[in-house]
Design a protein with these regions (language model features):
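Acidic, two-metal ion nucleic-acid-processing modules in DNA metabolism proteins
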Residues: 1-132
């Protein structure tokens, strides 16, 4: 009989493998979805990517912004862009990759680049004006 692993053991192996293979911070482009803040100030959200032709989802990941980061990041982003930090906007975020045995894969946000969102807003504005 083959050696077996419990689900927890397998998930722990996945966590250790990800920690070794993806130890750094990464800048990731994505759209925000399902942004919500809990009573302790942590922000939980989904990052999504859609196919530009069909608008169908092609990638999704859970995200977390811990309260100590979110307290600084949200006002910085909103003041820089004039845009609420909410679902439906495209962002460039610096993340670390995490995997928890119980909660699975997620991205933890460390920073945000508001100039990326400003560029996307300007591009969308130009498209609307062109259609008029």
């Amino acid at each position: 009989m083959q050696d077996t692993l419990s689900l927890y053991e397998l998930n722990a192996l996945v966590r250790r493998s990800l920690e070794q293979c993806l130890p750094d911070e990464y800048w990731v482009q994505a759209e925000l979805s399902d942004v919500r803040t809990n009573s302790t100030g942590h922000c939980y959200l989904e990052f999504v990517q859609k196919d530009p032709r069909s608008n169908n989802l092609i990638a999704k990941a859970r995200g977390t912004i811990w309260a100590n980061i979110y307290r600084l990041l949200k006002p910085y982003f909103e003041e820089s862009t004039g845009q609420l930090f909410t679902s439906g906007i495209k962002v460039l975020v610096k993340v670390t990759v995490a995997f928890h045995e119980l909660y699975g894969y997620s991205l933890t946000v460390q920073d945000i680049d508001p100039t990326y969102t400003l560029g996307d807003m300007a591009r969308r504005r130009r498209e609307v004006l062109r259609q008029l």
